[in-house]
């Protein structure tokens, strides 16, 4: 892989509308060749996806996924720009895949990092700052370590940051961007809810032997 300059990355971004990191990777994979890098982005469905992301996505669909055994269920809203696209196989396939992803990730609570409340971030920071292994370290070093740990922890809570269950080489965010590029519309994961059978219900734990004994004496 070739080293690429910041100017090349910027030029490719201006040309394709793809993200900076995607452009850098495309150029590295293409030995700095702009034409090949553009083709690489198109094949990945990334080219122009960033430009589409600024357009309003008010159509779409609400999908469901019920896991085998019917113990976990998911409702998920996926948005696009037109009803025609919402009915298409690519969009419906993405809807199913992302809903399945939510079912497989019990720790996920938010769609994106921007949705994480400030108080949640501060709480995580407070917990990490109090770790025994950080005691005695300089404040600047401690802050840097905590920032890294928090970043990793917060990613675990975010749907778009998860490795895609069908292809761990990409994240859910990259999957959505790829499909958006193929469809030619802005596609956004709006919200989701994950249900687990019996979650939140308190069940009385009765000793079976005692219960049988009480039945005999009744």
Curated annotation (Swiss-Prot):
Associates with the EF-Tu.GDP complex and induces the exchange of GDP to GTP. It remains bound to the aminoacyl-tRNA.EF-Tu.GTP complex up to the GTP hydrolysis stage on the ribosome. The keyword Protein biosynthesis applies. The lineage of its organism: Bacteria, Bacillati, Cyanobacteriota, Cyanophyceae, Synechococcales. One of its GO terms (cellular component) is cytoplasm. One of its GO terms (molecular function) is translation elongation factor activity. Its main location: cytoplasm. Pfam families: EF-Ts_N (PF25025), EF_TS (PF00889). Keywords: Cytoplasm, Elongation factor, Protein biosynthesis. Belongs to the EF-Ts family. This is Elongation factor Ts. Residues 82-85 are annotated as: Involved in Mg(2+) ion dislocation from EF-Tu. InterPro entries: EF-Ts_dimer_sf, Transl_elong_EFTs/EF1B, Transl_elong_EFTs/EF1B_dimer, Transl_elong_Ts_CS, UBA-like_sf. It is found in: Cytoplasm. The keyword Coiled coil does not apply.
């Amino acid at each position: 892989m070739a080293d690429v300059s910041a100017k090349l990355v910027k030029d490719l971004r201006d040309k394709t509308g793809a993200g900076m990191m995607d452009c850098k990777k495309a150029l590295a994979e293409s030995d700095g060749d702009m034409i090949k890098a553009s083709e690489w982005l198109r094949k990945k469905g990334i080219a122009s996806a960033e430009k589409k992301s600024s357009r309003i996505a008010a159509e779409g669909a609400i999908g469901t996924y019920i896991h085998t055994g019917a113990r976990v269920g998911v409702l998920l809203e996926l948005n696009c720009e037109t009803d025609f696209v919402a009915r298409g196989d690519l969009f419906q396939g993405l809807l199913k895949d992302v809903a399945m992803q939510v079912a497989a990730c019990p720790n996920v609570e938010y769609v994106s990092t921007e949705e994480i409340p400030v108080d949640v971030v501060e709480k995580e920071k407070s917990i990490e700052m109090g770790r025994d292994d950080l005691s005695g370290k300089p404040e600047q070093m401690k802050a840097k370590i905590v920032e890294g740990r928090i970043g990793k922890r917060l990613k675990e809570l975010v749907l778009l940051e998860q490795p895609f269950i069908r292809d761990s080489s990409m994240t859910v965010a990259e999957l959505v961007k790829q499909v958006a590029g193929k469809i030619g519309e802005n596609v956004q994961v709006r919200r989701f809810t994950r249900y687990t059978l019996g979650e939140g219900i308190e069940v009385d734990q009765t000793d079976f032997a005692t219960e049988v004994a009480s039945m005999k004496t009744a």
